[in-house]
Amino acid sequence: MESPAFSKPLKDKINPWGPLIIMGILVRAGASVQRDSPHQVFNVTWKITNLMTGQTANATSLLGTMTDTFPKLYFDLCDLVGDNWDDPEPDIGDGCRSPGGRKRTRLYDFYVCPGHTVLTGCGGPREGYCGKWGCETTGQAYWKPSSSWDLISLKRGNTPKGQGPCFDSSVGSGSIQGATPGGRCNPLVLEFTDAGKRASWDAPKTWGLRLYRSTGADPVTLFSLTRQVLNVGPRVPIGPNPVITEQLPPSQPVQIMLPRPPRPPPSGAASMVPGAPPPSQQPGTGDRLLNLVEGAYQALNLTSPDKTQECWLCLVSGPPYYEGVAVLGTYSNHTSAPANCSVTSQHKLTLSEVTGQGLCIGAVPKTHQALCNTTQKTSDGSYYLASPAGTIWACSTGLTPCLSTTVLNLTTDYCVLVELWPKVTYHSPNYVYGQFGKKTKYKREPVSLTLALLLGGLTMGGIAAGVGTGTTALVATKQFEQLQAAIHTDLGALEKSVSALEKSLTSLSEVVLQNRRGLDLLFLKEGGLCAALKKECCFYADHTGVVRDSMAKLRERLNQRQKLFESGQGWFEGLFNRSPWFTTLISTIMGPLIVLLLILLFGPCILNRLVQFVKDRISVVQALVLTQQYHQLKSIDPEEVESRE
């Protein structure tokens, strides 16, 4: 992969294996150093400044990538001019000092000439870079000046009617209808051209603006356009090298102590303020590795309990340490950069192993179409696609939580939605026991199952898709989040270790170079140490700047992933993460509360049914008792009696 230029000039070299050591560290870290990710979100500020007065006419900030942060800039012509033009004329008056001058200013056309690329004969700042006709590239004039190569276009906005808007409402003219703050009645709109969106804005660029008058000299003002990108400066460590001190063995399990009832303070004793809790210590290497394996076991045990009756989970000690599983998911669409994607990071990590089939976006080449179950094309427009919680976009330019459709439409970049899993292998007990037994015959190499194959799709499928259908789904999702937190902690510790090694190597190289200079002085008569050793090439190439940049970028990306993970956590899940006693209390009283609620809901109905049933049975018994005590009289038909008579 492509690497940036060396951060320092070439120096004398005493150790030719230095670059190889640095490359080994980079491979160990699993990071590849390239140019900035095109999907990286920055805080970009565009500033328009009057070069004659130094005042800022407009300062607009927005979040976005370096490809689509080119907004329309709105400001007033009088913000560029100030109180007076450089050479006021009688028909212009005092420029923008008075309402009449502001009103007369908007009656004139204007034209703009670039100062960043001055054509022959266009003059300098005194002429506003408009020394002759044909130098103008944009403006608002009857001949419609335009250009195909300039970076901006500047036109008038919606110019208000009447003289009211030219009066300043803040200095006693508020009673005048239409008065505005500052009396701004010459609105301008600055837009970036296609050439401006492709240009480099590393330094300010200058233009000259002139009012067009039929007679006399055209007044001039100069302005600059600057792009400022918020960036995080380098972190400078203070203290001992933490590489060795961080290699701690696994900590012993903490014995749980039952809380004791508080004792009342003795009479007359002064009230004691409890001290602040001790700061939490960062886990050592042993704890981090055990957390990864323990998180893998908990997630596997809740999803496939039959596989964890007796098994061995082994953490792979060589790279790659992580692998990706392509998944299908529903991403969120944002018109502006989300807050969890606004962390300024300039690096990218790559995955050397991606399996499965999932959601792909962009122009996927034929060599990688096997990873795509569904391929979506991005539509026109500028918006951002944020990956669901627990997933990340694996692009041809690196890993990123957010995608910019502007970048996808302008480049050949493509991305796959993946889950990130640690490289943990699953082995049956027979395989592990066989490694320690004495065998004369060996079976063929067994197939190693990794955690990604066993749990792939846990975020977007299976359990996570069934959230709300039962407690098992919630618990399993919780275990998956614990595993993701362990992965994040391990990556952060890996970044810190490599950064400390890089600084140690830099210190060592400085000592070696000092020794080299001393040897050159000793062998000065022979032409220096290189000539005395009869070596043709004796230079030291410092590659530590590459490692330093890579680690700074890795640290910032981890912060970005942490914010994305926290933003994707629901309120119900966060409720149980606040304190352990709250979780225990809820799980203890949840059962009785549910039973009590069911009794209150269905108890009255069941009781009424029971009372009605008892009443019916009692009425039947009463009827039987009355029937036995009385005899029914025989009914006589009157017709039959008459017939007898």
UniProtKB/Swiss-Prot annotation:
GO cellular component: host cell plasma membrane; membrane; viral envelope; virion membrane
Region (Disordered): 259-286
Region (Immunosuppression): 513-529
Keyword check for Lipoprotein: yes
Taxonomy, superkingdom: Viruses
Pfam families noted in UniProt: TLV_coat
Disulfide linkage: C113-C130, C122-C135, C311-C314, C311-C538, C341-C395, C360-C372, C402-C415, C530-C537
GO biological process, one term: symbiont entry into host cell
Site (Cleavage): R444, E445, L624, V625
Keywords tagged on the record: Cleavage on pair of basic residues, Coiled coil, Disulfide bond, Fusion of virus membrane with host cell membrane, Fusion of virus membrane with host membrane, Glycoprotein, Host cell membrane, Host membrane, Host-virus interaction, Lipoprotein, Membrane, Palmitate, Signal, Transmembrane, Transmembrane helix, Viral attachment to host cell, Viral envelope protein, Viral penetration into host cytoplasm, Virion, Virus entry into host cell
Keyword Coiled coil: yes
CDD domains named in the record: HTLV-1-like_HR1-HR2
Membrane-traversing stretches: 586-606
Region (Fusion peptide): 447-467
Coiled-coil annotated spans: 490-510
Lipidation (S-palmitoyl cysteine): C605
Known role: The surface protein (SU) attaches the virus to the host cell by binding to its receptor. This interaction activates a thiol in a CXXC motif of the C-terminal domain, where the other Cys residue participates in the formation of the intersubunit disulfide. The activated thiol will attack the disulfide and cause its isomerization into a disulfide isomer within the motif. This leads to SU displacement and TM refolding, and is thought to activate its fusogenic potential by unmasking its fusion peptide. Fusion occurs at the host cell plasma membrane.
Name of the protein in question: Envelope glycoprotein
